[in-house]
Amino acid sequence: MFGIGAGVSFFVNYSHKNLPVQSSPAISTPVPAGTEYASVRELAEQMSRPGGFTSEGLVTYLQERIRTLDPQLRSVIELNPQALETARALDQERANGQVRGPLHGIPILLKDTIETQGMQTSAGAFALVGAPAGKNAPLVDYLISQGAIVLAKTNMTELAGFRGTPDGWSSRGGQTRNPHHPDADVGGSSSGSAAAVAAGLAPLAVGAETNGSIIVPAALNGVVGLKPSVGLLDRDGIIPASQHQDTPGPMARSVFDVALMLNAMSARKSHDSASVEVDYTKLLVPDALKGKRIGYPVTFTANGEVQALENSAQFSKTLEVLEAQGAVLVPINLRIADASGYEKLLLSDVKEELNGYLAKRTGLPVKSLTELIKFNEDRDGKDTDHQPDLKKINDSTLDPASRETAWNELIQDFRSTVDEPIKTHTLDAIVSDFDTNSYFGVAVAGYPGITVPSGTTEDGLPTAAHFFGTRLSEPTLLAVAHGYEQAAQAATKPEL
């Protein structure tokens, strides 16, 4: 049930062998080999210069790469049939002297929780297939208004991991594989977004996170992933899990490209947004680390007891790079907040929000969590239980008023675990080894974090550093992460 391609034949229009082959007019300049790993700026320069390749050519090149490589990776769940037509129109705009912005003509990928007009939005679940979105999520419109091209939707851990299945597996898309090694952990739930960017199937992707769903797969697949402050970006039109933690976020192969994408994603405000007018690329300067006070945990306190934290040899190298670039390193203690009530609160949120979303979404075969569970039972068979977490969610009961009070108390406690050392030591940011699971507390707090490649393990798999800070500290985090990335030069490409 959990093997590659499981269930794909059920809906053959979205299996790889049936992805639409779109006709393309002759392209004057072929897209050269290696372009799949070019930065956004490099792609834009090529498309802007006389004799350079076109956006249409780039889309065609990446579509062919998807058809060649993705049957093994299972990172893409559906190609956008309008991508080439959109590329042609944007090429014409460029020829007429109209360039919408840095993302003009740049292909992007969207996680399959993000509503995209004319395409399925299923969170990887067959139960949510059959009614293409009638309009874009506002976030998608923001990106399109900046000239981005939706190339495809990406596979993911089904229902953002709340079905209880392995990371990267969905009934609709099969098992996403880590491009660095097919048996390595791919992470979740934005598995396909991270794997596809790492494999050079697109330069940019949008993931979404409740807890770890951007940070974890980005780290494990060796790309940059930013989990923004909750409320910074518009969440309308994205299949929800928890209003207290949900946020979309950009994924790319460099911090600069993540910053470019964040600019486009926060281009407009909504009732949900806490955004401020800022160009996130302006602070990405060569000496960004000089004088920055960066805390790193050497101890942690749990249940009132202080314990030593053993950092990896790779993390020690990360600290050496930061110090060599002029950062002031400050050893700190991190308090571990009490998370004993977290699961009950989260599952109650998921039940309320998923039921609300399904009830409003038109044309789906299921209209509630109960119907979704029944759909899966009828399809998979009652004797094979592949949805233990869904049943647990559906059985959860919490009074809404007491739940909100408990959430507020929990969030404040988790925020203080980050705020206290930053205030005490006058820190600009905190850095930790990704393996310390620091992303969990950052997610509960609703605070931002960014993961950056830091090297490889003895087995050649990516390692990562995790930078995080207080609410709306994205400009500082991006600057620090960029400075580290440029000095470390630790990103690696998979051998495909």
What are these regions (language model features)?
Residues 105, 145, 149, 202, ...:
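Glycine-rich, small-residue loops and helix-cap segments
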Residues 1-86, 317-320, 324-327, 374, ...:
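An N-terminal boundary/leader segment
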Residues 253-278, 303-337, 355-375:
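Acidic-enriched catalytic cores of C-N bond-cleaving enzymes acting on peptides and small amides
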Residues 45-52, 63-71, 81-84, 88-96, ...:
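Sec-exported extracytoplasmic/periplasmic mature domains
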